[in-house]
């Protein structure tokens, strides 16, 4: 979530009789970071041809998405009936695994979103300057195509005079029998 602490407190107030302060909620968030329950993904700020402002708010993820599933008391059937929620937990799972792989390569995983709504779920960036753009989707041809189009739009905005082109663009999906390379990149 990119929600501010204030927004989280306001959401909690609508669902709970016991209100907490923004300061207290911020303290809880910091405690959850320290005990490795949540982790922030920083915003990626590439050199773009466009003057569109890049949003720089961190995205907060559970270290292990099963924590969120357990807190909400959800089971497999609940997730299958609510694919939007399932998609959020799937994205968290994928980001966690991408972080493990990136760390082994001395890299980091970021996210990207600009004011126009163009976003990239994960940017795997290595210390040598190479990077890859990743869209995460549960699956289905329509969503895969949307993800690929989104990555193309972002790649076209990157100022390749100031930084390299992406080393790869990937739509990471939860369904399908195999990986394949598309003709559009």
Can you annotate each of these PLM segments?
Residues 74, 146-147, 182-184:
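Short amphipathic alpha-helical segments
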Residues 67, 116, 140-141, 176-178:
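Conserved nucleotide-binding/hydrolysis micro-motifs of P-loop NTPases
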Residues 139-160:
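Mg2+/Mn2+-dependent nuclease catalytic core
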Residues 125, 131-142:
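Active-site ExK catalytic segment of metal-dependent nucleases
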Residues 165-174:
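Short, hydrophobic beta-strand segments that form beta-sheet elements in well-ordered domains
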Residues 1-130:
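Accessory nucleic acid-recognition modules appended to NTPase machines
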Residues 174-185:
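Domain-level recognition of nuclease-like catalytic cores that cleave nucleotide substrates
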């Amino acid at each position: 979530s990119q929600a501010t602490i204030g927004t989280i407190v306001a959401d909690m107030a609508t669902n709970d009789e016991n209100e907490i302060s923004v300061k207290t909620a911020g303290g809880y968030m910091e405690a959850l970071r320290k005990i490795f329950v949540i982790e922030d993904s920083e915003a990626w700020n590439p050199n773009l041809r466009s003057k569109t402002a890049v949003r720089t708010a961190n995205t907060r993820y559970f270290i292990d998405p099963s924590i969120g599933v357990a807190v909400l008391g959800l089971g497999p059937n609940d997730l299958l009936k609510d694919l939007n929620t399932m998609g959020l937990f799937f994205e968290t799972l994928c980001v966690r695994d991408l972080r493990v792989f990136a760390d082994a390569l001395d890299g980091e995983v970021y996210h990207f979103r600009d004011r126009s709504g163009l976003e990239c779920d994960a940017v795997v960036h290595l210390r040598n300057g190479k990077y890859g753009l990743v869209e995460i989707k549960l699956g289905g041809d329509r969503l895969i195509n949307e993800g690929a189009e989104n990555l193309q739009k972002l790649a076209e905005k990157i100022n390749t005079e100031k930084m390299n082109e992406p080393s790869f663009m990937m739509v990471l999906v939860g369904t399908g029998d195999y990986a394949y390379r598309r003709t559009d990149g």
